[in-house]
Amino acid sequence: MEVLTNQPTPNKTSGKSNNSAFFYFESCQPPFLAILLLLIAYTVILIMGIFGNLSLIIIIFKKQREAQNVTNILIANLSLSDILVCVMCIPFTVIYTLMDHWVFGNTMCKLTSYVQSVSVSVSIFSLVLIAIERYQLIVNPRGWKPRVAHAYWGIILIWLISLTLSIPLFLSYHLTNEPFHNLSLPTDIYTHQVACVEIWPSKLNQLLFSTSLFMLQYFVPLGFILICYLKIVLCLRKRTRQVDRRKENKSRLNENKRVNVMLISIVVTFGACWLPLNIFNVIFDWYHEMLMSCHHDLVFVVCHLIAMVSTCINPLFYGFLNKNFQKDLMMLIHHCWCGEPQESYENIAMSTMHTDESKGSLKLAHIPTGI
């Protein structure tokens, strides 16, 4: 799942086009209003993504002092990776796409691409761990239960996997002025400009890596998460019918339905946010001629913008829909502004639910007001 700041430039500067400086040509220049709206959208996402995820991390760590919780730890790791995505993806992508050449040096050329790929990998793998934890908690409550130590080891493992998986990107990106050599421009504004592009030993190597990255960063993890949540939903439905027959409290049934919708929304939203950019990358890698137009960068930025929305969606689902989180957030803001100590508050685990199986009786335990 390549979300690199330099993704658009290889398309239009790989020795195949005279479109490299399409912003220069009046006929290809995107409308000012479109650029302005994109900049505003990116700014809003950047602020919401950083503020939302940072708030979630702070509140979770404050809760961890009172009670260790596996799901909270995994959510904090997810929020950390989302912050890295905001910091390393959005600013460099916007600047590089609008300027149409790289101005941050060779080290940042390699580092930004590498960190971006690592961040995306950590995000999706964190979602996988959360799905596994919820599956064990709900579908298999009597089986193996992840503990806090398992959560930390899992986080270390996914960071190591992500760091290793993205090494080829670090090695393949280089600065070069070759894309600008064959341009026919009325001025020499691009004479000394360079682009940050992927340079592979062969096209086959690039296709193998990009396809493998797509499978490992998107298709396979998303499919696994979907299966886990599907089984969770089916399990919750079955238990809902059992609770209904026992005439249990209907408020619990309503919470059950809300959790079902929440679980499905998480998966659907993540998949939908990253789908356009993945389609763009697949087309670029296999049928790049389809993208050789003066509006190539604009299409890429729109796809990238939609993907970046996922950094705001995660805090929304995992935190802002949690009434206890909203209360804690207001207390945190009040503490930051007024400097007054926060009141003690109840630790609310962000897990979905747990079951109480005793004496052959199955009943739903209390489901928190947020995941």
UniProtKB/Swiss-Prot annotation:
Record's subcellular location: Cell membrane
Record key words, sorted: Cell membrane, Disulfide bond, G-protein coupled receptor, Glycoprotein, Lipoprotein, Membrane, Palmitate, Receptor, Transducer, Transmembrane, Transmembrane helix
Lipidation (S-palmitoyl cysteine): 336
Pfam family, one: 7tm_1
Disulfide bonds: 109-196
Cellular component terms per the entry's GO annotation: plasma membrane
GO molecular function: neuropeptide Y receptor activity; peptide YY receptor activity
Primary residence: membrane
Record topology, Extracellular segments: 1-31, 104-111, 172-206, 285-297
InterPro entries reported in the protein's UniProt record: GPCR_Rhodpsn (IPR000276), GPCR_Rhodpsn_7TM (IPR017452), NeuroY6_rcpt (IPR000986), NPY_rcpt (IPR000611)
Residue ranges of the TM segments: 32-52, 83-103, 112-132, 151-171, 207-227, 264-284, 298-318
Keyword Cytoplasm assigned: no
List of glycosylated residues: 11, 18, 182
Tissues/organs with expression: Kidney and discrete regions of the hypothalamus including the suprachiasmatic nucleus, anterior hypothalamus, bed nucleus stria terminalis, and the ventromedial nucleus.
Membrane-protein topology: Multi-pass membrane protein
Cytoplasmic domain ranges by topology: 53-82, 133-150, 228-263, 319-371
Domain of life: Eukaryota
Family according to the record: Belongs to the G-protein coupled receptor 1 family.
Annotated function: Receptor for neuropeptide Y and peptide YY. The activity of this receptor is mediated by G proteins that inhibits adenylate cyclase activity.
Descriptive protein name: Neuropeptide Y receptor type 6
Gene encoding the protein: Npy6r
